[in-house]
Regions:
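Extracellular structured ligand-interaction cores
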Residues: 17-23, 50-52, 145-147, 339, ...
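Extended, low-hydrophobicity, Ser/Thr/Pro/Gly-biased non-transmembrane segments
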Residues: 1-77, 361, 443-448
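Short, glycine-/Ser/Thr-/acidic-enriched flexible segments
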Residues: 60, 97-99, 154-155, 209, ...
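Short, ordered beta-strand-loop transition motifs
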Residues: 41-51, 80-86, 332-338, 396
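Long, ordered, helix-rich scaffold segments
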Residues: 228-229, 256, 405-537
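Beta-strand-rich binding/interaction modules
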Residues: 311-314, 322-415, 508, 512-515, ...
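Hydrophobic alpha-helical and helix-loop surface patches within well-folded domains
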Residues: 55, 84-332, 336-337, 342
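Long hydrophobic segments that form regular secondary structure
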Residues: 254-288, 323, 328-360, 364-366, ...
């Protein structure tokens, strides 16, 4: 974030935007490639076996996006034709001898370019786009304008050594850095407190790219698993902070799961509340208002409000509150009136962040959050009670009751479909109800979630006996898993990948958090033994 000040004197702030012309001169033999941001406008030979290249970036940018590469590298290149008919040179530069491992990354870049045109109407704005991958780059990747710098982990892949996840990660990271070209570069953040403006939004965009390129259901499951393992503990610990913190001692400490992953969930909730079409209009308005500017999270939310007509005043609290909200749900069915009543209650426990604010004399945000709760009601025959399958409820009070009429039979409630909000859910459901959701829920994420909750219950029973033996494993759970596997083997596209996720047991870290939440002592050995025993049963 603040590396340019180590190169030369400069007002090193993200809101100081300038156009750069960079001339590089070096020895031809040692440094055959001379690269920088923007378009190559001139090059030539110099005295003494040297050569030079002049790069001009026509778009104003903050200095943290400057990059310069002088090296001996191999290059794999191709041409991408934009929606308007422009030809863009796409190039991947790697250390000599590794060119055969770059094909997937180059293809991923072209896929990302096409997807951004189709989904958000955003076209590549330069004559060329370059990726430079080196093994000792200290981050995963960086979105320097037109010249992305990558660690080789997210570029190099060979079919005989790389896994499916390696290829997916290359797709996602290449996409993420390219998507920054608009959400981060063309429109950047006014100050580092607004880091999630570009990172949360761009993570959301790369998540949507991954969902469209691969499996939407599997991608969402993987995202939520990461959120629960990496971000929820951060929210519950001494380093808890909101998506937009009020203070920091060191900017490098800002690159957290909260700013990135929870920030993406905040953007996703906006789309859930206003709808996908209105969200696209909001993105169009955001760029129309702020292209070439350094702006704030408030500017982004304001564009979404203006484009949708939805008041997001209360929703803004998500940007200022630390911690993971807890959502308690209770449902009741009146057979005579054919009415289902759902009561939702939200709480948010104080975190160490609020204590630090009070010590510093800074204001503390309070009041209930605006939580989108996507709900479905699954009838005994496995069908959805709603014609539209899912309804999005706006929980804006500490406690609210929602009434659903003309429900013909006792339903099983499917809450937080597609994980519509980053919260803990407390909702008592029987094993039979969870098994029903696992088999019939039209929401793929909640089918997986029901299976995870069932597996957690089984594993907690095993942990209680130290993970020894197998008489704590119910036959009904084994049967349910067999049905999932059978469905995956005879299903349609992506069903095998979804079945693999459904049969993956909750992580040991997740189980440890559940045990701790019950007030019990965490026994890592018992957790490990129980998980291995169930997996091998």
């Amino acid at each position: 974030a603040e590396g340019f000040r180590r190169i030369t004197f400069f007002p090193d702030r993200p809101d100081v935007m300038a156009r750069y012309t960079c001339t590089i001169e070096a020895d031809c033999e040692r440094f055959p490639q001379l690269l920088s941001n923007g378009n190559l406008v001139a090059k030539g030979e110099a005295d003494g076996g040297r050569h030079w290249a002049r790069w001009e970036d026509p778009f104003a940018k903050p200095c943290y996006l400057f990059a310069l590469v002088a090296a001996r590298l191999d290059v794999l290149e191709d041409v991408f034709v934009t929606a308007s008919g422009r030809k863009v040179r796409c190039a991947v530069y790697v250390e000599p001898g590794k060119l055969d491992q770059c094909g997937h990354a180059l293809a991923a870049l072209k896929k990302a370019m096409r997807w951004d045109e189709e989904r958000f109407g955003l076209e590549m704005d330069l004559d060329g786009y370059m990726i430079v991958a080196v093994g000792d780059f200290n981050m995963g990747a960086m979105e320097n304008k037109g010249l992305n710098i990558f660690n080789t982990k997210y570029v190099l892949a060979r079919q005989d050594t790389a896994t499916d996840m390696d290829y997916q990660n290359i797709d996602r990271v290449v996409g993420h850095e390219y998507f920054h070209n608009w959400t981060g570069n063309r429109v950047t953040c006014r100050d580092w407190f607004q880091l999630s403006l570009k990172e949360g939004l761009t993570v959301f965009r790369d998540q949507e790219f991954g969902a469209d390129v691969h499996s939407r259901a599997v991608t969402r499951i993987q995202e939520v698993r990461t959120l629960r393992i990496a971000q929820f503990p951060e929210d519950a610990g001494p380093m808890a902070h909101p998506v937009r913190p009020a203070s920091y001692a060191e900017i490098n400490n800002f690159y957290t799961a909260t700013v990135y992953e929870k920030g993406a969930e905040v953007v996703r909730m906006i789309q859930t509340l206003i709808g996908r079409e209105a969200f696209r209009r909001g993105m169009d308005l955001y760029f129309a208002r702020h292209d070439g500017q350094a702006v704030t999270c408030e500017d982004f939310v304001a564009a979404m409000e203006a484009a949708s007509g939805v008041n997001l005043t209360q929703f803004r609290r998500w940007y200022a509150r630390a911690g993971t909200p807890r959502l308690h749900a209770a449902g009741q069915y009146d057979a005579a009136a054919k009415r289902f009543t759902l009561t939702l209650t939200q709480t948010l426990a104080p975190t160490a962040y609020e204590a630090r604010l009070r010590e510093a004399g800074l204001p503390v945000e309070d009041g209930p959050l605006h939580i989108p709760v996507a709900v479905g009601l699954v009838l005994p025959d496995g069908s959805d009670a709603f014609l539209a399958q899912t309804r999005v409820l706006s929980l804006t009070e500490t406690c609210q009751t929602f009434v659903f009429e003309d429900i013909p039979a006792t339903p099983v409630a499917s809450l937080l479909r597609d994980f519509s909000a980053p919260v803990h859910l407390d909702f008592e459901q029987t094993d039979t109800e969870l098994a029903h959701l696992m088999a019939h829920d039209s929401d793929a994420f909640n089918r997986w979630e029901a299976g995870q909750r069932l597996a957690t219950r089984v594993l907690l029973a095993g942990i209680a006996v130290g993970g020894r033996g197998n008489d704590w494993i119910p036959a009904s759970f084994v049967t349910a898993c067999a049905r999932v596997l059978e469905a995956g083997l005879r299903g349609v596209r992506d069903s095998a990948a979804l079945a693999a996720e459904a049969l993956t047991l909750p992580a040991e870290q997740v189980l440890a958090e559940v045990v701790a939440g019950q007030g019990r002592v965490i026994d890592p050995d018992a957790i490990h033994r129980a998980r291995i025993q169930l997996r091998c049963h």
